[in-house]
Amino acid sequence: MKFLTSLLLLFVVVMVSAVNLSMAKESANQLTERLQELDGAAIQEPAELNRHKRLTCEIDRSLCLLHCRLKGYLRAYCSQQKVCRCVQ
């Protein structure tokens, strides 16, 4: 009788663990999706920084590239509005 009780208890523990693992994987997938959404979201920058970017493009385009390289980006360009844009 003890053997059957132990076996039943072990079965319950394994099933609960499997359910918890499944829920953890689902939560991890949801978190990954949310992080990808946030990664793709546009980030608003302060007006002062935008003003600095415009001045960078109006003075010299190479300063825009230097600015972006220092931030870790590979390429840079100046938009029609003279705003420096950094691109991977």
From Swiss-Prot:
Native source organism of the sequence: Sarcophaga peregrina (Flesh fly)
Protein name: Sapecin-B
Tissue expression notes: Hemocytes and fat body.
Family: Belongs to the invertebrate defensin family. Type 1 subfamily.
Propeptide, residue positions: 25-54
Annotated compartments: Secreted
Cystine residue pairs: C57-C78, C64-C84, C68-C86
GO CC terms of this entry: extracellular region
Signal peptide location: 1-24
Keyword match Nucleotide-binding: no
